[in-house]
Amino acid sequence: MSSRIIRATAANSSIRAFVANTTNLVEKARGFHQTSPVASAALGRTLTATSMMGVMLKGEKQKITTKINGGGPLGVILVVGDSEGNVKGYVGNPQVESTNIRPGKLDVGAAVGSDGEITVIKDLGMKKPYVGTAPLVSGEIGEDFATYFLNSEQQPSAVSLGVLIDIDYRIKASGGFIIQVLPNVQEAVLAKLESRIGQLESITVMMEQGMNEVDILNHVLEGMDPKIVETYEVDFECDCNVARFEKGLISIGRQEIREMIEEDENTELVCHFCNKKYHFNKEQLQGLLDEM
């Protein structure tokens, strides 16, 4: 089953909602990076949130980048997404040791750390990208995105993200939701929503119970008449290619390329996002030098 996001409204369009099932997408990322359980959870949550934020973008070629740096042993989390919800990403230390808060509950906050910030960069096709930052609250990622929305975009939001890891370290389930109130929301609706959010079990419990994205939408916004507006098929997609790496080599300068030619028979470059390896022999490197 492919990963999917639904965009919906509720309460006479005074609430907007995004609900994601990203199980296959996050499993693909785990396969590329061979992440430990806690790294899978942290990366999976960030991929899920960024994918939902991607479909919030208006333009076809607009991009979003999310960077989380909490100073923890996991290192930096970096995720890039497009306006169709497709994402790619990596963590600084994919094999970081996993610890639990309690049995079955990974301590994502300890791995990520909370001494740092979340940065969101939106490339909207303008001269300069939009850059927003917010301090990390817990390193658990869901709370940190909610803080970002409130502090940087002045948008009150409920954010829930979760990744279930199987005993063989594969991704059993992954998903999340972002619920946002719009300026026309009535006080009674807001109070009802706040009460409902406060009563909810975690997103991982919902997924363990077998709920899909539509079930979760109806469960979270029960009694608020949710209506699905659009459905997106999303995936972990890396757009790396030989031409991009050739450009990267050219950008480091003639001297560096000469040193590579002198030192090695073959130069190996690895994509951070998908771990695909690219090899350049001396003749290819010399060809790049000749083009410069």
UniProtKB/Swiss-Prot annotation:
Its main location: cytoplasm. Disulfide bonds join 238-240, 271-274. Pfam families: HSP33. It is found in: Cytoplasm. Under oxidizing conditions two disulfide bonds are formed involving the reactive cysteines. Under reducing conditions zinc is bound to the reactive cysteines and the protein is inactive. One of its GO terms (cellular component) is cytoplasm. Keywords: Chaperone, Cytoplasm, Disulfide bond, Redox-active center, Zinc. GO terms for biological process: protein refolding. InterPro entries: Heat_shock_Hsp33 (IPR000397), Heat_shock_Hsp33_C (IPR016154), Heat_shock_Hsp33_N (IPR016153). GO terms for molecular function: protein folding chaperone; unfolded protein binding. SUPFAM superfamilies: Hsp33 domain (SSF64397), HSP33 redox switch-like (SSF118352). Redox regulated molecular chaperone. Protects both thermally unfolding and oxidatively damaged proteins from irreversible aggregation. Plays an important role in the bacterial defense system toward oxidative stress. Belongs to the HSP33 family. NCBIfam families: PRK00114.1 (NF001033). This is 33 kDa chaperonin. It comes from Alkaliphilus metalliredigens (strain QYMF).
